[in-house]
């Protein structure tokens, strides 16, 4: 059922209730502390507690598994959760996507669904997950899985592209409380998937080199990416993802990193998810109740930023120290914090705690 832009599923009321209850609980009692330990031990504990029938996105109210959260967690979660568990999650998402005919944004232990709406990054992160398993274990998709992935990729390319780039009709992505038309982030995810496809035995209509050229021509502005097709505003998540995956030449990545630093988006905590407030046309009514959420520092994106800088050989010691400070202060891996380091909170939404992709990105940063 559709309600405006929202996909209304049986899980939606539960998610709203969990978010609101957690916001009030944190407002009254603060963030409940996890068992004491070093930042790495706290991160590992969060992953283990979230690893149930599906790898829940968090401990407080994200009691589902988003495909993109899972994909961004893989590099850091591998040693803690193991190939058997993570591989089982990859296989479950693949089989369920085959049943649905597309890759939904979210899963519980029973089925896949979209929440709060379909997203353009789901298929790419499932493809990335298969690629990461291949790199880690040498296990390529078997014939059945490869056939499923080929069908899913065919559907993705047929429905998501227009004129060689992600269509403006595709407005959902990981920042899933705003609707960015043809977000540069979604285009970078498509580039990631096209780069992964050949090693998995998949055939694609497009190719990575051509799409990379289109992205640079359409979205690169000399020292930054613009956020989406309808704006010239600087994109933080596009810079971070490009660094993390090494999607472009080093000269471009260096300029993108320098601009993020010059804008002080990684201060006082790494990293603000948006350089400027989102255009009102991209912000649905319910999101306007939590407008400060997108001006907070999102620590999973911050850890990914630091991992990208680390791959470029830059000093990440000060940034990691700030993450350590927050983890030890709250006794948890948080999702989003205000300038004073307190957890973001509104009447209906609070920062998640024990956030899977933040914990995993931190462990990747720590080299564990």
Regions found by a protein language model. Name each.
Residues 109-113, 286-291, 341-351:
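Short beta-alpha connecting loops at secondary-structure transitions
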Residues 18, 25-26, 30-37, 41, ...:
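Catalytic cores of carbohydrate-active enzymes
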Residues 31-36, 77-90, 133-150, 197-212, ...:
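Structural helix-adjacent loops and short alpha-helical linkers that scaffold large soluble proteins
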Residues 270-298:
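Generic long, charged, amphipathic alpha-helical segments
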Residues 44, 71, 75, 241-244, ...:
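Amphipathic alpha-helical repeat scaffolds
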Residues 2-65, 85-92:
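Low-complexity, Ser/Thr/Pro/Gly-enriched N-terminal "stalk/linker" regions
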Residues 63-163, 187, 296-306, 316, ...:
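Aromatic-rich carbohydrate-recognition surfaces in CAZymes
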Residues 298, 302, 306-333:
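C-terminal hydrophobic structural anchor segments
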């Amino acid at each position: 059922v559709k309600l405006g832009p929202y996909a209304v599923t049986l899980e939606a009321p539960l998610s709203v209730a969990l978010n609101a209850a957690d916001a009030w609980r944190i407002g009254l009692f603060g963030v409940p502390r996890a068992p004491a330990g070093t930042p790495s031990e706290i991160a590992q504990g969060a992953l283990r507690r979230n690893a149930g029938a599906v790898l829940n996105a968090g401990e407080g109210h994200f009691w589902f598994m988003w495909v993109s959260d899972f994909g961004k967690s893989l590099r850091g979660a591998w040693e803690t959760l193991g190939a058997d568990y993570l591989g089982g999650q990859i296989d479950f998402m693949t089989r369920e996507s085959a049943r649905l005919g597309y890759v939904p944004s979210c899963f519980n232990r029973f089925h896949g669904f979209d929440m709060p709406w379909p997203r353009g990054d789901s298929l790419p992160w499932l493809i990335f997950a298969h690629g990461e398993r291949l790199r880690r274990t040498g296990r390529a998709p078997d014939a059945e899985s490869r056939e499923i992935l080929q069908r899913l990729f065919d559907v993705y390319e047929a429905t998501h592209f227009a004129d060689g780039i992600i269509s403006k009709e595709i407005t959902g992505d990981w920042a899933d409380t705003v609707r960015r038309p043809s977000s540069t982030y979604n285009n970078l995810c498509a580039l990631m998937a096209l780069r992964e496809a050949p090693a998995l035995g998949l055939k694609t209509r497009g190719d990575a080199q051509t799409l990379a050229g289109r992205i640079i021509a359409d979205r690169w502005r000399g020292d930054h990416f613009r956020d989406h097709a309808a704006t010239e505003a600087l994109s933080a998540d596009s810079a971070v993802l490009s660094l993390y995956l090494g999607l472009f030449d080093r000269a471009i990545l260096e300029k993108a990193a320098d601009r993020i630093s010059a804008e002080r988006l990684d201060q006082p905590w790494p990293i603000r998810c948006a350089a400027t407030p989102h255009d009102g046309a991209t912000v649905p009514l319910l999101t306007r109740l939590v407008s400060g959420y997108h001006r907070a520092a999102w620590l999973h994106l911050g850890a990914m930023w630091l991992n990208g800088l680390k791959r470029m050989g830059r000093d990440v010691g000060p940034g990691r120290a700030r993450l350590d400070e927050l983890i030890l202060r709250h006794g948890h891996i948080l999702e989003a914090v205000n300038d004073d380091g307190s957890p973001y909170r509104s009447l209906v939404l609070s920062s998640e705690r024990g956030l899977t992709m933040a914990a995993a990105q931190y462990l990747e940063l720590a080299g564990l």
